[in-house]
């Protein structure tokens, strides 16, 4: 019935789903940092010539990022659309015994539009260390990254006589470790590199305290990994 439908909409608006959505999006976005670092290492090894990563002979490099993502809604939650753009820069050099070591930093911005007019923006500041070791055709790559987030959320709550515009500003962080092993198979007409990779990602915010109306939410620190 219409009453049941209105009740479902009210519960959805009260839930503060935008905070879970932005956390999910930032965890998913963590892959862009490690993909860039692994891509740079493959480039330095001579296994890839990525046009997205611009590098000089001294080991300095930069990559512009632009990505779009979405999550579909269902009977229990609304979906969202998100975009992330920014730049990563780094510097690496060859070391003794076929090692390569480097550091990287960068800035990205994530904008997310959720259900019922909710919106979240996050300014993301990245710092990472990475490296690889080659054993003939076998390459081992890995690194660690840390990202600081400054999150700004806005959401509307409208049902019955209730009409709120609730906002929040809070910080969060993402930590990640990643490793990859690849084996280069080079032939006269074909070059292949079968590989396997692993990643551990931990996200934690510093608590949420919305301001606005009676529907404003407060929450303690939350983390996911």
Predicted features along the sequence, with ranges:
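Outer membrane beta-barrel translocator domains of Type V secretion systems
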Residues: 2-192
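Outer membrane beta-barrel transmembrane domains
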Residues: 175, 186, 195, 199-202, ...
